[in-house]
């Protein structure tokens, strides 16, 4: 049984065959899926999916590139959604300096990142963290969050092995997806080799980040076995052990998911 901790089935790339795709991946052994909001609109669609399918759970939040969606009114709406029993995390939230270089934009990202972390603390929910080209600021903010007993996962991890181990020391999990199968993913392979298996979560970020041999195509959760096989190869263990351990990790973090 595979636990997919980061999907975007609300994405428009699934609009023509969304239900068929979700049913297919479930039949292929993906027993639990967290669909992750990235904007107010996608969070609404995420919640609709979690109402429709008993194996899909919702993460509610606004991605740093979509913080124009956030004001006190929409933030209050987000707070209300954290009370729903099928909301299992706040996310995806964080910092993305890849596109946004302006200091005032980055400051606004940090402001709403911290506000959404406070939301997670209020609701006793874990967080799903997006961080791109913002390693130091993210680490500083998450170090403070750990002091408030906020738990979570660093999604689609892309920084150094050393920083990953620092996150683990703070109590966070590391999300690993299709990138680990890429030929140029030496840094991530090294990170996985150094991480304890009991701190890794499986994810796709679908429809993005399809693993080899499907790189460049629309991704979905049925591709997770490629990620499992690669992690098993790196760690010198069996795919079954990777599947079992990462599933247990996900249940340990996302406590509102029915086990």
List each model region and its residues:
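Mid-domain alpha/beta scaffold segments of enzyme catalytic cores
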Residues: 1-259
